[in-house]
């Protein structure tokens, strides 16, 4: 089973690599081929949906496992797809960025610091595609920030990189006009209580 999984993840990495390179070439071309661009966006979106679906399905079935076993399997998964999620998120395609953020949020307990910094990078890339203007984005980011304020407060207190990432994420959504992001920003002093 491990060999099959490793081969599958290798194919996924190759597909994501080809997709992101093709997307970058199409987006920067002065004579943009809109049909090819649409197809590449569709492929990237499908990949993002499938990865997020796999993580959600695993988390839903995880209660049958012990905490250590569940966390170990999720850690293994994140270790294998973390860079793939970065590559997908770097496209800036709003729908793809959303799926990547959703998948990363489910991996937060594996490595809270790395996941949070990765979310911040992906959200920054998402600005190119208008991710911050999407209602689903707002809900996902508000949930994630609230979770980090509740479960990983010490990380935000002690790690300047994580605080900077938090401020960057909230700033993006405040500038987009989201009242929820503004409210979270006003309540940031609770991090230091």
Can you describe what each PLM-predicted range is?
Residues 1-193:
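Non-catalytic all-alpha helical scaffold/repeat segments
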């Amino acid at each position: 089973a491990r060999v099959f999984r490793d081969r599958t993840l290798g194919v996924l990495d190759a597909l994501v690599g080809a997709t992101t390179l093709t997307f970058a070439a199409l987006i920067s071309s002065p004579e943009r081929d809109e049909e090819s661009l649409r197809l590449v966006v569709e492929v990237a979106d499908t990949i993002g949906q499938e990865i997020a679906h796999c993580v959600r399905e695993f988390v839903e079935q995880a209660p049958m496992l012990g905490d250590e076993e569940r966390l170990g399997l999720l850690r293994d998964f994140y270790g294998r797809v973390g860079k793939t999620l970065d590559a997908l998120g770097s496209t800036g395609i709003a729908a793809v960025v959303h799926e990547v953020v959703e998948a990363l949020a489910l991996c937060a307990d594996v490595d809270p610091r790395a996941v949070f910094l990765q979310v911040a990078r992906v959200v920054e890339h998402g600005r190119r595609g208008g991710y911050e203007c999407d209602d689903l984005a707002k809900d996902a980011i508000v949930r994630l920030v609230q979770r980090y304020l509740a479960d990983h407060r010490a990380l935000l207190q002690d790690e300047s990189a994580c605080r900077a990432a938090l401020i960057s994420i909230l700033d993006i959504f405040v500038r987009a006009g989201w009242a929820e992001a503004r409210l979270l920003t006003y309540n940031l002093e609770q991090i230091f209580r």
